[in-house]
Amino acid sequence: MTLLISNDDGVYAPGLNALYHALKDLADVKVVAPDRNHSGASNALTLENPLRLQYLDNGFIAVSGTPTDCVHLALNKICITVPKLVVSGINHGANMGDDVLYSGTVAAAMEGRFLGLPAIAISLAGQTHFESAAFYAKQLVGKLLASPLSTDQVLNVNVPDLPLAQIKGIKITRLGKRHKAEMIEKSVDPRGKEIFWVGPPGKIAEAGDGTDFHAIENGYVSITPLKIDLTATEQLSDLTKWLDK
């Protein structure tokens, strides 16, 4: 039995290493990850350039592409045995609310699900207690292997950046919301050309009870099921009426 692991922080990221060591006792683990940080890459595929592989001494494979490239390449060319599950993470920072639209971590899991496999994305709401995220990753992956989910969904998991003993449990949540990000930093490079830096995500706009933000803020692991089908089904009838006016 094989598990495929990827991430968006890159093949040398501590979170990826923590995830590998947490899961290696459950199955044969194949690690295929970007050769550098691709945070915020979303579902981008590399179409204009070839992908190059680097086989590392620890058995990991580094790819000169995005998280989605890594999973796409792994499932179509690298993996001899079809994995039972795609696991993405452990991300260095939370992926909650609108973050999931930009997240390379979530995108890697989405690509696995798009190609027909169960998938889970795991993020730590900080950069310290990877052991806590690794513990919950092992528990949840073990449960998915024993009792696979049959619906077309990806599990988006966020873990509080706390010592394991301080985490209160797990909550099933919905996505919260952020205000739009407005901060763009304008600067000048050494040659006098203007450059721009995209700022941090917008502030939290909706973090009520039942949201991923609320769970993390109160010391709980958040699990949010995500759908690949983005169709706003509830709006189909209204849109038809609007068109017929």
Swiss-Prot record:
Its EC number is 3.1.3.5. A divalent metal cation binds at residues 8-9, 39, 91. It holds the Pfam family SurE. It is found in: Cytoplasm. InterPro entries: SurE, SurE-like_Pase/nucleotidase, SurE-like_sf. Gene3D superfamilies: Survival protein SurE-like phosphatase/nucleotidase. Binds 1 divalent metal cation per subunit. GO terms for molecular function: 3'-nucleotidase activity; 5'-nucleotidase activity; exopolyphosphatase activity; metal ion binding; nucleotide binding. Its cofactor is a divalent metal cation. It comes from the Bacteria. Nucleotidase that shows phosphatase activity on nucleoside 5'-monophosphates. Belongs to the SurE nucleotidase family. PANTHER family: 5'-NUCLEOTIDASE SURE (PTHR30457), 5'_3'-NUCLEOTIDASE SURE (PTHR30457:SF12). This is 5'-nucleotidase SurE. It comes from Psychromonas ingrahamii (strain DSM 17664 / CCUG 51855 / 37). The lineage of its organism: Bacteria, Pseudomonadati, Pseudomonadota, Gammaproteobacteria, Alteromonadales.
